[in-house]
């Protein structure tokens, strides 16, 4: 790794488009990452989206592989991780979306399984905004788990499947569901409408 100024043992994540190797990301045991200089920005495991109508997007390669262990094949990872909430200019960081747009044209459901920290939430928001919130679903993890790999290690494959099965449709501004107003409706059912303002006329105020 040139970042460390020395050779080191690494995991190599190979990025393919079709049969063409377009990029390689290296990761050592200290979680230092490096990509091939000049490599193209695409999703990891992009070929797995061929002929799919649903997909899962993760924040890292290990998370994508964790879902694969749980039995999901239609999983990809972004190449550059989460997005710092303080950074304003992020277009170049999301170039992979433009480079892979054809793969998402026919997607009906897109599960956003990013990390639950601030950079992961920012990434999720940007992905939903660009891919279309009406077809995006938020994947949430159990308490104490930051990402899909945490869930797999701590709870196993079945729990990771539950995370997908219980995913929530991305909230769309201006649209409300009955469940969002459950407490208000229950109060209205049990207590009725509140009394209006007094008019001062007893016949009207009854």
Q: What do the PLM-derived regions correspond to, one by one?
A:
Residues 1-11, 48-57, 122-183:
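Short, small/acidic-rich helices and loops at N termini and domain boundaries
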Residues 74-77, 111, 136-139:
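Short hydrophobic alpha-helical runs that function as membrane-insertion/retention elements
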Residues 66-70, 87-88, 121-125, 149-151:
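A short acidic (Asp/Glu
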Residues 112, 148, 204:
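A residue-level signal for conserved active-site and pocket-lining positions in enzyme catalytic cores
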Residues 2-106:
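Phosphate-handling DNA/RNA-contact segment within nucleic-acid enzymes
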Residues 55-57, 103-119, 140:
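Acidic beta-strand-to-loop metal/phosphate-binding motif
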Residues 173-206:
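The Walker A/P-loop phosphate-binding site
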Residues 83-85, 114-124, 143:
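Acidic, metal-coordinating catalytic cores used for nucleic-acid/nucleotide bond scission
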């Amino acid at each position: 790794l040139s970042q460390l100024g020395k050779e080191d043992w690494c995991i190599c994540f190979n990025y393919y488009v079709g049969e063409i190797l377009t990029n390689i990301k290296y990761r050592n045991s200290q979680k230092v990452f490096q990509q091939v200089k000049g490599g193209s920005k695409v999703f990891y495991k992009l070929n797995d989206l061929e002929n799919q109508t649903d997909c899962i997007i993760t924040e890292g390669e290990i998370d994508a592989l964790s879902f694969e262990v749980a039995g999901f094949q239609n999983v990809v990872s972004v190449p550059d991780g989460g997005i710092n909430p303080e950074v304003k200019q992020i277009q170049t960081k999301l170039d992979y979306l433009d480079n892979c747009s054809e793969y998402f044209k026919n997607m009906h459901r897109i599960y956003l399984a990013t990390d639950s920290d601030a950079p992961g939430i920012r990434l999720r928001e940007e992905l939903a905004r660009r891919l279309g919130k009406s077809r995006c679903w938020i994947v949430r993890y159990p308490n104490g788990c930051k990402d899909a790999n945490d869930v797999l290690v701590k709870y196993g494959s079945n729990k990771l499947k539950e995370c997908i099965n219980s995913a929530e449709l991305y909230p769309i501004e201006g649209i409300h569901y009955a469940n969002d107003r459950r407490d208000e409706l229950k109060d209205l059912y049990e207590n009725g409408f509140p009394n209006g303002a007094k008019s001062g006329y007893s016949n009207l105020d009854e």
